[in-house]
UniProtKB/Swiss-Prot annotation:
Keywords: Cytoplasm, DNA-directed RNA polymerase, Metal-binding, Nucleotidyltransferase, Transcription, Transferase, Zinc. It comes from Nanoarchaeum equitans (strain Kin4-M). GO terms for molecular function: DNA binding; DNA-directed RNA polymerase activity; zinc ion binding. Its EC number is 2.7.7.6. PANTHER family: DNA-DIRECTED RNA POLYMERASES I, II, AND III SUBUNIT RPABC5, DNA-DIRECTED RNA POLYMERASES I, II, AND III SUBUNIT RPABC5 FAMILY MEMBER. This is DNA-directed RNA polymerase subunit Rpo10. GO terms for biological process: DNA-templated transcription. The gene is rpo10.
Amino acid sequence: MLPPIRCFSCGKPLGHLWEEFNERVNKGEDPKKVLDDLGLERYCCRRTLLSAVVVFPVIAKFKKV
């Protein structure tokens, strides 16, 4: 799955927040603090970013038939 472009529930654009969110969380920062800093207040948007799993690099390793 690619990073989410919009919230699945309310439709708010989230694509521009994905890279910063992912970088900061991977560095060990608390996801709650990162989401608060990014200005995400709605729980649906927070859920969308928290639950996103990017598997594209894994899929790209397989050859096309």
